[in-house]
């Protein structure tokens, strides 16, 4: 093998390794059996959510994962493999892939990485049930507002009760 080919492969592995480093989550799937239309629809939905899906050689994936300390993923890099990387929303790849896996039996989630930790299939499926970032932020805002809202209602009720009392 020529030095040029080896250098090119090393550059590909380095690029994948950088994607693993910068990703908040990555989901590894087996896509064998999906039609072109299904893969196109999946890629479109992932892209709209800010997720990048790539079909990569298992050897490159294994080397890049090992370089980042994700040796536990070596077993999932077998057969046709695609990886969905997200740099922003750690839930998006899991949620979208789980949705498509439910719709199409051909798509199988193998494993992944969440917040720089290797995640099992069960963990990814649990993550897929969580709301997206905006949903989580709105839930947090609601929880933070509840005590203030309740206090305001109590103050209003006390004020109304004082207004209704006859003057003595």
From Swiss-Prot:
Belongs to the universal ribosomal protein uL10 family. GO terms for molecular function: large ribosomal subunit rRNA binding; structural constituent of ribosome. CDD domains: Ribosomal_L10. It holds the Pfam family Ribosomal_L10. PROSITE patterns: RIBOSOMAL_L10. The gene is rplJ. Part of the ribosomal stalk of the 50S ribosomal subunit. The N-terminus interacts with L11 and the large rRNA to form the base of the stalk. The C-terminus forms an elongated spine to which L12 dimers bind in a sequential fashion forming a multimeric L10(L12)X complex. Keywords: Ribonucleoprotein, Ribosomal protein, RNA-binding, rRNA-binding. The keyword Iron-sulfur does not apply. GO terms for cellular component: large ribosomal subunit. NCBIfam families: PRK00099.1-1. This is Large ribosomal subunit protein uL10. SUPFAM superfamilies: Ribosomal protein L10-like. Forms part of the ribosomal stalk, playing a central role in the interaction of the ribosome with GTP-bound translation factors. One of its GO terms (biological process) is translation.
